[in-house]
Amino acid sequence: MRHGMHHRGPMMGPMMDPRSRLFMALANDQRLKILTLLKEGEKSTAEILEALQLDPSVVSRHLTLLRNVGLIQARKEGVSQRYTVADERIFEMIRLASAIIKDWLDKHLEFFE
C-alpha cells in the first residue's frame, strides 16, 4: 500500500490543505446528490437513503465525510439524525464549477462541429 493511501482512496488527514479536503469531498457524484437533496431542506437519514438507493454503510460514510469538512450538519431527532447544509455558499461554488465546465465544453466542442 502506498504512503498516504488506503483501500478507499486518498486519505484526508489533518495535514491536508483544507481546500483540498473540501474539493475532495465534492469530487463524488453521491455526495453531490446528497448536497442537492439538502438544498431542498432538512432531510432524515432515511430520506437520504431512499433517494440514493445505496447501502446504508456507504451513505453513512458519505454523510460523515461531508460533516467532517463542514459542508453539512446533523441534529438528533429521537433515534434518527436530520441533516442540513452548513453553509449555503457551497451551492454558489457548485454553480461556478458548472459554469466553468460549460464554458470549457462550449469552447472545445466547437472544434468537433
Please provide the spans of the model-predicted regions.
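Residue-level detector of secondary-structure transition/capping positions
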Residues: 42-43, 67, 98-101
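Alpha-helical residues within the helix-turn-helix
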Residues: 50, 67-68
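N-terminal helix-turn-helix DNA-binding core of bacterial DNA-binding proteins
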Residues: 13, 17-58, 77-89
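Residues within the DNA-recognition helix of helix-turn-helix
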Residues: 62
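Amphipathic alpha-helical dimerization/coiled-coil segments
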Residues: 1-18, 90-113
